[in-house]
UniProtKB/Swiss-Prot annotation:
Protein name listed in UniProt: Chaperonin GroEL
Quaternary state and interactors: Forms a cylinder of 14 subunits composed of two heptameric rings stacked back-to-back. Interacts with the co-chaperonin GroES.
Organism from which the protein derives: Bacillus pumilus (strain SAFR-032)
Keyword Cytoplasm applies: yes
Family, as annotated: Belongs to the chaperonin (HSP60) family.
Gene: groEL
Amino acid sequence: MAKDIKFSEEARRAMLRGVDALADAVKVTLGPKGRNVVLEKKFGSPLITNDGVTIAKEIELEDAFENMGAKLVAEVASKTNDVAGDGTTTATVLAQAMIREGLKNVTAGANPVGVRKGIEEAVKVALEGLHEISKPIEGKESIAQVASISAADEEVGSLIAEAMERVGNDGVITIEESKGFTTELEVVEGMQFDRGYASPYMVTDSDKMEAVLENPYILITDKKITNIQEILPVLEQVVQQGKPLLLIAEDVEGEALATLVVNKLRGTFNAVAVKAPGFGDRRKAMLEDISVLTGGELITEDLGLDLKSTEIGQLGRASKVVVTKENTTIVEGSGDSAQIAARVNQIRAQVEETTSEFDKEKLQERLAKLAGGVAVIKVGAATETELKERKLRIEDALNSTRAAVEEGIVSGGGTALVNVYKKVASIEADGDVQTGVNIVLRSLEEPIRQIAHNAGLEGSVIVERLKNEEIGVGFNAATNEWVNMIEKGIVDPTKVTRSALQNAASVAAMLLTTEAVVADKPEEGGSGGGMPDMGGMGGMGGMM
């Protein structure tokens, strides 16, 4: 296919038009008085959102060169979302400011390579400044503040804070759609996996159709059990103790299952059989997790252990186990806390090493089940459109809160970026490198300018006053007051602000040093040009 090529100024200008088109659509959502953007959906109702990355992903421009510019800025939003989970609009605003100011200077004769060096130097100093003013996040109240700011909703903030308090910072918090109008929190304590009882005859509560075992012994094996003789010795020891038994195996069937059911119905002893969770290597890893959590041993031939010679001391214990048709929950396993901590650290190391997103997600789930539990935030709303928008906001708030716990918080509302202004301004450089530093200085003001603009105020006046205020004091656009941002709970996670600045600078530097842009040439008239001639097929009616 033939290519269309544009060079230097013409190429950069075309890309800038695309950058502006996307950034102008995204930046109207910034701040407490930001507006919404409506996105057309081919099927169903339109999506109304103020989430920067969602808007950026939807934008596709007709002109190929402009579209490349738009896609580069969409990449800034997307990358920031991947790393920090929020701050996508801030990143887009910063990228647009750097690209626009940079192109002005390059057009006026500045050397793009020198400008790029200046941008990189200034961003490095700005990041050091951010870490200096960053404060660690402590306590439920601080977590609630971060979440409330991101979701623009105090109720959501307190829900997320409660969820993180209940399941710990490593816990899994999932967001689901609720059937009702209210948003609520549901927490599953202990370890839960998606396998239910092998037979409905094993239930202890026929109303709820669940089996509840108090202080049970837990036999964990990766073998298939078909013959009751294999587990009879250990079964007799459990019966003597007068305790119920949870049997987790690859499968329990045939005579073994029938014997367990018959004895349960007769009231001889209470045993519930459950299939092992997961598949393949992941199954073995999850069984090992359960054995660490309950203080038992995994009975596997890999370790030379045999079911027939299993002693009661090799079984795990828990204060309670609840088994339903689809799930098994182990509450308060009796495992050694030092061993559980070691296992948690081992899984954390695997999370850091893996490159697969799927593996990472599964490892995070295992980590959560060992470290705390699983919380589900059920989002409710009056209409489907509102539900989708609310769910997106809560996802952003959750990501934002996690980022805050990780790297601390800085003053929100664009204040932190202006707080590092003086540190960046102190850089001594010459020529085009200094031009690059000046571009970053101008860009640091842009988020607060946009927040003020969206609130119907003049950004320049607020920026000038902010530069002269002490660190931490900023402008609250929601109330039009000057306040101590951290005291008032108007905060941003350091990780979000850092990622936004880094990613914006990276793409801006790349775009400024672009000298040629290549795109597919649109085909003249398109390939469908011959189609109208098919009208002659109408004569085929005579063939009947």
